[in-house]
Design a protein with these regions (language model features):
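Sec-dependent N-terminal signal peptides of Gram-negative exported proteins
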Residues: 1-7, 330
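N-terminal active-site segment of His-dependent metallophosphoesterases
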Residues: 5-67, 160, 181
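Mobile, glycine- and charge-enriched loop segments
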Residues: 9-26, 30, 150, 154-185, ...
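Residue-level marker for buried hydrophobic side chains located in beta-strands
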Residues: 13-15, 48-50, 89, 173, ...
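A mature extracytoplasmic/lumenal domain signature
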Residues: 17-20, 127-130, 177, 227, ...
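Active-site glycine-centered loops adjacent to acidic/histidine catalytic or metal-binding residues
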Residues: 18, 52-53, 92-93, 176, ...
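Extended active-site neighborhood of metal-dependent phosphoesterases/phosphodiesterases
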Residues: 60-170, 190-202, 210-260, 264
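A short C-terminal boundary segment appended to hydrolase-like catalytic domains
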Residues: 245-339
Length: 339
């Protein structure tokens, strides 16, 4: 009997975030999906949790093309069905960002926040997306694309579910955004204390930014950001924007969590290291050394931090001011001599 119970409480699940294509509807990275499916099938989890940004969602369009977005949902759901196991979802800001996309989500997948039990553990699926007011045509403001802190209603859901699952052996939490990134984030004072009181083992998010992967441990809870970037930004963006380079130069990844009784082990699996062709010396040169030897690059190499740049600007400004003052003094002296 004990052996059977121990066997029943040994299971695994995968956590995968930001699998969307784009930009634009209908742009689906099928080659990368095929690799993802192979890796998930190889890991053979009992179920998968998808942590948001699963379709492009006609993001920022003035009027959402409902048929196009629904077609993309059909396409990605067909991919996810190939995992060969149950799939659970939380929304990202591309999935739900105005009234039409919200209606599509709820009609296909039900409530934005859910929980379920598996082998004595409790799993909380949370919504971290901005939502329009009922009947409003408003769209997600740019300042909220990284999510919103959980309001009183969403926190009440967490409290109820944790209270109902106080006997759970483990608690795992999933959401679309990295709401704990900043040290002064409301998450740490409003949500983390609730999770700390339960048997919470890990919290997972799937959004990009500032990295694809990050991890912090606090009070015995692992906070894991794990995501993929199947649509590579143009080379000009990678050359010109440090934030884009930091993302694109991390490997795509997903989490595989193995639970064996009281033991929880989180493994990070990578995607595209060999298959994508993105991590070659030629790619590095194309992004980082395309202007090697140029005057601009030589100047940049001398001032490769903001502090150095500001220091040089101060020196140049001070030099210009002193030079101007000296020229002014000389001209004044000459004019007085002639007077």
């Amino acid at each position: 009997m004990l052996a059977a119970l121990a066997l029943a409480q040994s299971y695994s699940f995968a956590v995968i975030g930001h699998t969307r294509g784009g930009p634009g509807n209908g742009t689906l990275p099928m080659e990368r999906y095929d690799e993802l499916v192979r890796e998930v099938q190889r890991a053979a989890p009992n179920f998968v949790v998808l942590t948001g940004d699963l379709v492009y969602g006609d993001f920022e369009a003035k009027s959402v093309d409902r048929a196009a977005v629904e077609k993309d949902w059909d396409a990605v759901d067909a991919v996810f069905a190939r995992f060969g196991c149950p799939v659970h979802r939380v929304p990202g800001n591309h999935d739900v960002w105005e009234r039409t996309t919200l209606e599509l989500w709820t009609s296909r997948y039900g409530a934005l926040q859910k929980s379920f039990e598996h082998e004595g553990s409790q799993f909380l699926l949370l919504n971290s997306c901005w939502l329009p007011e009922a009947g409003s045509d408003a769209q997600c403001p740019p300042r909220f694309i990284r999510g919103v802190q959980l309001d009183a209603e969403r926190r009440a859901f967490v409290e109820r579910e944790l209270a109902a699952a106080e006997e759970a052996r483990h608690v795992f939490v999933f959401l679309g955004h990295v709401l704990w990134w900043d040290e002064d984030a409301a998450w740490w004072s409003e949500v983390h204390p609730l999770l700390e009181q339960a048997n919470t083992r890990a919290v997972f998010s799937g959004d990009l930014g500032p990295w694809k992967f990050s991890h912090v441990e606090r009070d015995g809870i692992d906070y894991v950001q794990s995501s993929v970037e199947f649509t590579v930004p143009p080379v000009e963006m990678r050359r010109n924007r440090e934030a884009v380079r930091m993302l694109s130069e991390q490997l795509d990844n997903f989490a595989l969590v193995r639970v064996d009784g009281d033991e929880v082990r989180i493994e990070i699996r990578t995607l595209g290291a060999l298959e994508s062709g993105r991590f070659t010396p030629a790619t590095f040169r194309d992004v980082h050394e395309y202007d090697a030897g140029s005057f601009e690059r030589k100047v940049w190499n001398r001032m490769d931090t903001p502090q150095k740049l500001v220091g040089w600007l101060w020196k140049l400004g001070l030099g210009a001011a002193l030079g101007g003052a000296l020229i002014g003094a000389v001209l004044t002296w000459i004019l007085r001599r002639r007077a």
